[in-house]
Amino acid sequence: MTLKRKIKALLIDLEGVVYQEGKKIPGSISFIQYLEKINFPYLFLTNTTTMPRKDIANKLLKLGLKTNINKIITPLIAAKNYLKKNHHFSIALYCNKRCYVDFQDFQINFQSPDAVIVGDLYKKFSWEKLNEIFLTSLNSKKLIAFHKNKTGTRKGSIALDLGPFVKALEYALDNDFILMGKPSKFFFQAAVDHLGFNKKEILMVGDDKEVDIRGAQNLHLQTCLVKTGKYGKQIYLKSIEPSYILPKLSSLKSILFQ
């Protein structure tokens, strides 16, 4: 297997690829430091919605990697740009309050907002909270979900993520939430445009078949599934075949550059 000269840029997932529940995956940080050293283009493409980009950058710094905040693409930033473009400045924001810093240009309004935005509330997703979001959404112009991941990893085990709660709201409202993060084409296209390369020259590296691999394939990107994070836990997705399967992120070094 060789990727030499075929790949000119990387899109890299974070959770399950670079780190797992706050602990770095062996070899990942040194691999990205090598990318920095040789000026190889890459972006982090993450569905993390529990913290703003500056906190993600600080998290990476604590793991030994100093990175430019503009290399981190999140659904929060995608949502912010979408809202501004469509002139929706009054919003009901249901997410971790740490993320409010990315929405300082907006008025938080839970009574009659232009848009309702739903992110990962983790254990705060109660019946009361879902019903509150449902009622707020009834008269909103736009319904936005940071992502619709079915599952994530909590305390070392696979667990429900944001997606099932969004689906419940969609069913009750008989209306769809606009997806901001992976696997939406909108999100991947924004990353491709940022990099400026042909789609066939970009490789998406992730641990989630449905969100990372299928999402990238829908935009005709090359894909690499790593055997860390969620790998092996999505047995119901056998039909999704990545371009490459590797043990971990750092395994790319010998294939790409040697």
What does each model-identified segment do?
Residues 2-29, 34-37, 54-73, 77-80, ...:
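Asp-based, Mg2+/Mn2+-dependent phosphohydrolase catalytic module
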Residues 48:
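Conserved phosphate/oxyanion-binding catalytic-loop motifs
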